[in-house]
Regions:
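Conserved SAM/SAH-binding beta-strand->alpha-helix loop
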Residues: 34
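Conserved SAM-binding loop
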Residues: 41
């Protein structure tokens, strides 16, 4: 079965692409408000995602759209201090999560997949995440993977429940991120109890062995740091070290480092670049004067990473857009500024991680289908026949879900309509003699 997704807070489509690559999902609607990101998204997917998910117009459009899974890489925002007792419509009002929750409450998708920064776990002393979990589990009727109830009926989870690092999914980037996956109890009923309590912790494919496999062998001189800026960074790091702080630049492929790995690349660019400096001496660079830099280029062979290298770290280049002929088709629209390229990659997701999550979600769907159809067959064996109402009561599922399961069992020729009835079904004697 192919599941339909909607891609909200879409950026340049990293989450969508990861789900598509699993082979089980196709996207039917998107929403993004950043003009430059929209241009890249349109360039990559042939679809203009320029929609504002906070508007009533868009929410009505979603309500009219047949889809199964809501995807969103939403921003981390503080909620009202009014308290959870008021419900998400009061507690989260004015945030993007409020609008996501509103859309979920109106449309009840089969599953929800949310991505956010690692800081979401501890944001506002944990209150932000607590509100999100409480909203999904308590108000919207979803089972969140990695969340359980303690003896007092409080939601229980740890960092390990949600945080996964890109470096464990085939790319050399130390990028811990929050991933929240939830399944509708209204649709799947007690089927959600059959699901595992843990998201995938590692991928099964190495995309780039280490940072050396990501780096371009030769880059344009413009990526080399000016002597003045390089000296400023060294002085800043010395001050930080003197004050007992570990902040400052980092040369991630310095001599002696085995299996080098990049630090997190960021949409803001600055610290993401300075914490990912590259040692790569190049003849003729030292002392060279460029019009774009105030001082000559440094003599130590230090440069920043290129947008192409950032694209590889996120799995966009060298992985996510390779066609059936093995050709890498990723590109930005002509004229996209270098600063925008850094921003869009830094603000996106790591596609190999998302693909692994998508495959895990598919496995969850398959497991619930298998378990629930098995229970239906067991009941038919015990009672001779079964109705839609029996399935609803047995599995605690919606009528739509009961009809879906029954349809699959009939198409598989496991069940047939009982003779002389219109609503009762029995085992197919040819399949179950």
């Amino acid at each position: 079965m192919e599941y339909k997704t909607i891609d909200l807070c879409a950026g340049i489509g990293g989450i969508r692409r990861g789900f598509e690559m699993s082979g089980k999902y196709s996207n039917v609607l998107s929403a993004e408000i950043d003009p430059s990101a929209c241009e890249t998204y349109k360039h990559l997917f042939g679809e203009d995602p320029q929609n504002d998910l906070t508007t009533e117009e868009f929410k009505k459009l979603v309500s009219k759209t047949e889809y199964d899974v809501l995807l969103a890489g939403f921003p981390c925002q503080a909620f009202s201090s009014a308290g959870l007792k008021l419900g998400f419509r009061d507690t989260t009002r004015g945030t993007i999560f409020f609008d996501l929750a509103d859309i979920i409450s109106r449309t009840n998708p089969r599953a929800v997949f949310l991505e956010n920064v690692e800081n979401l776990y501890s944001h506002d002393k944990g209150k932000t995440l607590k509100t999100i979990i409480s909203t999904l589990e308590g108000e919207l009727g979803y089972r969140v993977i990695g969340v359980s109830l303690d003896e007092n009926g409080e939601y229980e989870y740890t960092r390990k429940s949600f945080i996964r690092n890109s470096r464990n999914f085939g790319v050399p980037q130390n990028r811990p991120r929050m991933y929240i996956m939830a399944f509708s109890k209204k649709i799947y009923g007690n089927g959600v109890k059959s699901l595992t309590d843990m998201l995938p912790e590692r991928g099964n494919q190495i995309i780039f062995q280490d940072l050396n496999a990501v780096l371009e062998p030769v880059v344009d001189d413009v990526y080399y740091m000016s002597e003045g800026y390089w000296e400023t960074l060294k002085k800043h790091k010395a001050r930080q070290k003197k004050n007992g702080n570990g902040f400052g630049y980092q040369i991630v492929n310095a001599v002696g480092i085995q299996n080098p790995c990049a630090n997190t690349i960021m949409a803001t660019g600055g610290s993401g670049k300075e914490r990912n400096l590259i040692y790569q001496p190049k003849a003729g660079v030292a002392g060279k004067k460029l019009k774009t830099k105030q001082t000559v280029l440094n003599s130590e062979g230090i440069r920043v990473m290129t947008p192409l290298e950032w694209g590889r770290l996120q799995g966009f280049i060298g992985y996510g857009f390779i066609d059936q002929n093995g050709v890498d088709t990723f590109s930005f629209p002509v004229g996209t500024a270098r600063a925008q390229q850094y921003k869009q990659f830094g603000n996106s997701v790591t596609i190999p991680v998302i693909k692994e999550m998508a495959e895990f979600m598919s496995a969850c769907f398959d497991k619930m289908n298998s378990v629930q159809m098995g229970k239906i067959v067991e009941l038919v064996k015990a009672s001779d026949s079964i109705t839609i109402r029996d399935i609803i009561e047995l599995l605690n599922v919606s009528k739509k879900r009961a009809e879906e399961l029954l349809k699959w069992l009939i198409e598989s020729k496991i069940l047939i309509l009982k003779p002389k009835t219109k609503t009762k079904y029995q085992l197919n004697s040819k399949m179950h003699p």
